[in-house]
UniProtKB/Swiss-Prot annotation:
Pfam families: Med20. Transmembrane segments: none annotated. This is Mediator of RNA polymerase II transcription subunit 20. It comes from the Eukaryota. It comes from Xenopus laevis (African clawed frog). InterPro entries: Mediator_Med20 (IPR013921). GO terms for biological process: regulation of transcription by RNA polymerase II. The lineage of its organism: Eukaryota, Metazoa, Chordata, Craniata, Vertebrata. Component of the Mediator complex. Disulfide bonds: none annotated. GO terms for molecular function: transcription coactivator activity. It is found in: Nucleus. Belongs to the Mediator complex subunit 20 family.
């Protein structure tokens, strides 16, 4: 586990989601990156009822329960603007038993799946975001494996991302500056995915509202 940056890449002009993914993967392969299997990250949204939590009249909060194929024995639970809980897979069973407090918004389940690439000390994952069977966007995750302190390797990561993302290379993730502990953790990656998937979800809602 190194330092990870998760970002969204817009569709290339006149291209579909799949065609844009192919453009990105072609650039990676031209650099010399090699395929290293596949990956997925999923995110289920749960609503908390204010009344059931002992606060009548208060709007419910959102809880995101997430999984990452890099950590197959773990489940991540994140509150909006809150802490990230890392648990084992029994948390999924517990959520079913807590349905009186947390209601699963099944229509809002999102996931990103794609191919992993290895390039020197970098691991790159390019994924297609889907809701149901509908493609909604593209995620790019870049891991710099030898380092665990974001401030020590960000410039190198940025230079590498620009080599295949061009002007779409991201700025410093907010989670880096929000950390109290200088060491990067898997929870920081899940926070980035949660924020990005929410952003993509809201983009779709906005587009639908304009039609």
């Amino acid at each position: 586990m190194g330092v990870t940056c998760v970002s969204q890449v817009p569709l290339a002009e006149g291209k579909s989601v799949q065609q844009t993914v192919e453009i990105l993967t072609r650039k990676l392969e031209q650099l010399g990156a090699e395929k290293q299997g596949t990956f997925y990250v999923d995110c289920e949204t749960y609503h908390t009822a204010g009344a059931s939590m002992g606060t009548p009249g208060q709007a419910g909060k959102l809880l995101y329960v997430m999984h990452n194929s890099e950590y197959p024995l773990s489940t991540f639970a994140l509150f909006e603007n809150g802490p990230c809980l890392v648990a084992d897979l029994n948390l999924d069973v517990l959520m079913v038993k807590l349905k009186g407090f947390f209601q699963n918004a099944k229509a809002n389940k999102m996931e990103t799946r794609g191919t992993r690439y290895q390039y020197c000390d970098f691991l790159v994952k390019i994924g297609t975001v889907t809701v149901g069977q509908s493609g909604r966007g593209i995620t790019v995750e870049v891991d710099y494996c030898p380092c665990a302190v974001p401030g020590d390797c960000w410039n190198l990561m940025m230079e590498f991302m620009q080599s295949f993302m061009g002007s779409h290379a991201p700025s410093v993730p907010p989670v880096f500056s929000a950390k109290h502990d200088p060491l990067y953790t898997p929870a920081d990656t899940m926070v980035q995915y949660m924020e990005l998937l929410n952003k993509i979800r809201k983009q779709q809602v906005t587009v639908a509202g304009m039609r």
